[in-house]
């Protein structure tokens, strides 16, 4: 069941001289942007501020996911700092350009529902007392949602706007096994169902370009998350990070890594298959320079974003136009 405890805004379409596209007066994209969603929900600019509470991951005992470097991509948070200090540091950066913006603390690093619930609750309570904080975002794994945690998330969702982000990466169970993900796609589907029973906004993380996956596999992942009824999605491009099992595999095998052109083509086709009411919260990866082995084109994030926009205009396509 889709959540109904917030004012969900559907994108509208309009006819233009060049064809059909989304009516999005903020940034004129052809897909449902997070910026637009936040603007419609809260009436002004909203930023997510990364928070690191040193959460670990239960899958680490089994070696962890093969691509994991135990770093958050492009995170401005520092797990050695007090959470209020982390939040203020992130907020100051945004305030320089957008002084009137609102904020959602984002528990980004690690598996946060694998942490002590009372510790997390204490952090959340402190953050919700701060001015301009309008919600909480918690990242976790679909296999780390106990009934105790679900009860707490249900309670939290009744207090504020809550986002729960779940890593899926691929709907192909053979791929999930190869990357040592530690769960199958049914676990993800069940987690989404349990969160939606509590009217919680659910975001899926997927990765394009996982070793030996075909374009069909990546499109099937989109069809799978559509069927799960997710509310938002983050689409990442696989990158090889230093000091990871994936780096060792890449050094020996040199498996194919998507070119920028291949990635853009796949993302455009994925967006066409994605329900129009799903918010696109991320559409490319954002690795740090010091850990990146390949692909080097991923460093230029805004070039990739602009090229996706250009390709959608060129092909006269938009999110969900094949549904």
Predicted regions and their residues:
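N-terminal [4Fe-4S]-dependent radical SAM core
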Residues: 20-104
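Auxiliary Fe-S-binding modules of radical SAM enzymes
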Residues: 22-36, 40-47, 232, 240-323
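Hydrophobic faces of well-ordered beta-strands that scaffold small-molecule active sites
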Residues: 47-51, 103-105, 136-138, 162-166, ...
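Core AdoMet radical
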Residues: 71-90, 94-117, 132-145, 161-188, ...
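Acidic (Asp/Glu)-rich catalytic clusters
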Residues: 95, 124-131, 153-161, 193, ...
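Distinct, well-ordered alpha-helical segments
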Residues: 117-125, 146-157, 218
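Conserved C-terminal portion of the radical SAM core fold
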Residues: 186-245, 261-284
